[in-house]
Amino acid sequence: MRLSKTTSFIVWILLLPGLAVLSSCSTKKNTLVRRAYHNLTAHYNVYWNGMDNLRQGVKESQAELKDNYAMVLPVFNYGDKTSATKLSQYADIGIKKASKTINKHSMVFNRKEYCKWIDDAYLLIGKSYFYKQDYPMARRTFEFVIKTYNQSEIKYDAMLWQARSNIQIGDFNRAEPMLDMLQSKIRKGDAPARYETELNLVYAQFYILQKDYAGAVPFLNRALELKPSSAMRTRCKFILAQIHQLNGETDEASRLYTEVIKHAKS
């Protein structure tokens, strides 16, 4: 059974007295009680503190960003260095919380990690560096996740973020094989289909930042078929309208612009 966030928080509060007693639990012994304690506290350190903090920072940053409508929009707008500087205070907390989670709660026995949130903590560190626009550190972190947790689905998240990092610094030769590999795994059923929406959006970003707008079109259309968020659907339609307009396909451009306007009014 999946608990709601509110219910989970209540459970967490009720468990606090017992956790205070367990707070001295060592990560050196592999027992059920120690695993339960470190998994529970790691979960809330990562998601309720670090991850939620980063999400809040990204949300505030996105609200302040301005798009340049004189150009074909990117799928993802991460802002400039000024935006990254403002976001850094949130990203730094994400890095701090995730690092604390790893240092205090990692339980490795016979080369197996028994705290299931450690890989998420590393991914959070990578995302935090990404939003700080420290792409070299982000790439190193995502590469570590891909290699270290290659038997876990989280490697697919890391592959997408690794590709995003390479795209942002213009290293398209490294981004493309990563995207192609994940696409192949999804088509073969080796990777979950839930990654396909984001994969198509990142592919579109890959082509748009190279000004290969024709290359982006099929990925934007496929992303729309997969029904991303409402805001992303509107953005994809607007980008497609811009591309059709550039190509002189005024009827299709007009149709898409009309859909965007209707959505904005609703």
Each predicted region: which residue ranges?
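Acidic, polar-rich low-complexity tracts and alpha-helical solenoid repeat scaffolds
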Residues: L3-T6, I13, V21, C25-S266
